[in-house]
Amino acid sequence: MMNVLIVHESMFGNTRQIASAIADGMRDATTQGGDVQVVHVDDAPTTIGDDVDLLLVGGPTHGFSMTRPQTRQDATSKGATAAREGVREWIAEVTPRHGLPVVTFDTRVHVKMLPGSAASAAAKALRHRGFDRAERGETFWVKDVQGPVVEGELERAREWGVALAARVSHGVS
């Protein structure tokens, strides 16, 4: 049995779509039962249950990293859904669980030579927080800050979900 929690931050809905596609892939690949939950960071638990086998954390890349209050405010002025907090703040509040596999992902605009990644920053912050098995996962591309998701990325996210499910079911996380 595999239980997965996917925590995401999504301002324009792009990262939510990616998180849902990853979850669909994991559900499609799981023959042993279990549960794959997708929750917005505003509703995410600050204690990860012992029944969770894999934690995925994803968010948009804003200002070369995870969002901050100012970048979220800027996005809201462009029509984004306002969030109480972002992945950065959630990581600062969540109780670490030693030994839990954690994989991060992000969405971002493909701009040549643009440094920084929310997935990299989140993995580093999670390790610093005490999640010793946190690793950077995938980046998924959006056409513009507001989206949409680049064609083919939802399918790639679903396929990545299938691959992650295989890793977990074989004990290689």
Features from the language model and the residues they span:
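Short phosphate-binding/catalytic loops that engage adenosine nucleotides
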Residues: 31-34, 131-132
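N-terminal beta1-alpha1 ligand-phosphate binding loop
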Residues: 2-30
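Helix-loop-strand module that forms the ligand-binding subsite of alpha/beta enzymes
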Residues: 39-129
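Glycine-rich phosphate/pyrophosphate-binding loop and the adjoining helix
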Residues: 132-173
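Residues at the starts of beta-strands that form the adenosine-phosphate
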Residues: 2-3, 35, 101
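A structural preference for short, hydrophobic beta-strand core positions in alpha/beta folds
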Residues: 35-40, 135-138
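Short histidine/acidic/glycine/proline-rich micro-motifs that form metal-
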Residues: 12-13, 108-113, 142-144
